[in-house]
Amino acid sequence: MKHITRRNFLKIGMRTCLYSFITSSIGYYYAKYIEPHFISFTQHTLKSQLIPKSFHGMKILQFSDLHLGYYFSLQHLSKVVSKINAVNPDIVLFTGDLIDNYQTYTDTPFVASILKNIQAPFSKFAIYGNHDHGGYGTEYYEHIMRESGFELLLNSEKRIHLMDNSEISIFGLDDILLGKPKIEKTLEHARQSTYNIVLVHEPDIAPKVSKYPINLQLSGHSHGGQVQIPFLGAIITPSLAKDYIEGFYTIQDLTLYVNRGLGRTRVPFRFMSKPEITIFTLQHS
């Protein structure tokens, strides 16, 4: 007989209570129709001596996991674009999972015309998530992002230069689950003297990333658990998002930030895990 720990016992009990709450009329309405539309703007300052003085004050915006489909419409996407432009980011980063299911989604031709309205003077970058490869979506996603003015980082590096020749580097890895990530081949080029950011959809790859001189890893995939229980945390965590679920973590010299994303998948609810757009302000220190 399998031994059940106290934590697992409590988790099962709380899951049952949460299920009862969500299936009640009030809980169901809140988790399905209210919280999923409460977009939280989280703002953080990134401090490092490696951040050039000329980059001081620059704003980097991360958004993730839209999962366009039944629970996230083009109208929702338009509102997100307006909210992004309202904060005037310098660099915009999308960390994967644009469309929930490419095989069933019928509005694919209209996505780029909305996404391309995102304004960022120092460029827009994107990486693949697992849903972007799934459902034969690989080529569709590439086309949409390029038409939207995003540079797709596929096991590659992009250096952001300013006129004084100062720079930071942004690396992008292919999706770990369904893509062809080349971690060593990509990150071995990271320089110790440069502030290095890596975009990778799945956060739990962070221990491998920490072996390289990467300062910041930005990920999504987890949805912050999408449904959380007080004192016990997330109860819905996908593969490679079980150790690092939301917010900041430190792994050796690496700082990891996991964005909760904006959409929903698998279940139509968000509870205690509001959709998130993150703004990082760079600070030389």
Where are these regions (language model features)?
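Extended active-site neighborhood of metal-dependent phosphoesterases/phosphodiesterases
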Residues: 42-45, 110-182, 188, 244
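Active-site-proximal beta-strand elements of phosphoester/diester hydrolases
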Residues: 57-67, 167-175, 197-200, 255-260
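Active-site neighborhood of phospho(di)ester-bond hydrolases with catalytic His/Asp-centered motifs
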Residues: 63-64, 92-96, 124-129, 153, ...
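C-terminal segment of N-terminal export signals and the immediately downstream linker at the start
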Residues: 23-59, 71-75, 79-82
